[in-house]
Amino acid sequence: DGPGVIRHIWITVDNKTSDGDCFVLRDLVLRMYWDDEENPSVETPLGDFFCCGFGQECIVNSSVIAVVPSRGLNSYFAMPFHKHARIVIENQHKNPIPAFFYQIDYCLYASLPANTSYFHAQWRRQALTEIGKDYVILDGIKGTGQYIGTYLGLSTLQRYWWGAVSYTHLTLPTKL
């Protein structure tokens, strides 16, 4: 119970439940609720929140997200709340997860400024985009705040490299 600010979240989890299984990080869903919200301000697969897309673990080194080789998932985003914070992990995986450990570091305060912004994160995927139609990255957020950034994972639906394009029809400038 708050007011307070979550300063650091550390999670480690087995990323496989068998040799042929590699989607634990995609199948664990992270939801965060601030104060009396009915709908989560954060709703994303656990791995994608920590910039490890497609259920694959990877190394990340940034000022707000760090994923270390020993599967330590770290978030340093400031996540303020006025009354209370609720963090939920839902297992949508086909098997039980044998190990899940976490630590949440936070500070409690007498009060927070009335204009304190809440932290939001959304996840979405789309198999095909449409030419001329904007791809929505963040939707339905009300109030003022700061846009911190986007983690974008890209994959191909084709068997071969998706970047192969013929440039023979293009005319290039002769001078720069």
Model-flagged regions — what are they?
Residues 1-24, 95-165:
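Solvent-exposed, flexible loop/coil segments flanking beta-strands in beta-rich domains
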Residues 168-174:
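Conserved small/polar residues in nucleotide/adenosyl-binding loops
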Residues 26, 59, 71-73, 163:
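Residues that act as N-cap/strand-start positions at coil-to-secondary-structure junctions
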Residues 89-91:
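Asparagine-centered strand-capping/turn motif at beta-strand->loop junctions
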Residues 1-65:
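An N-terminus-focused feature that recognizes amino-terminal "leader" regions
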Residues 61-83:
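Beta-sandwich interaction modules
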Residues 86:
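Active-site scaffold segments
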Residues 38-41, 129, 159-161, 171:
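Short, surface-exposed beta-strand/loop "edge" segments at domain boundaries and coil↔beta transitions
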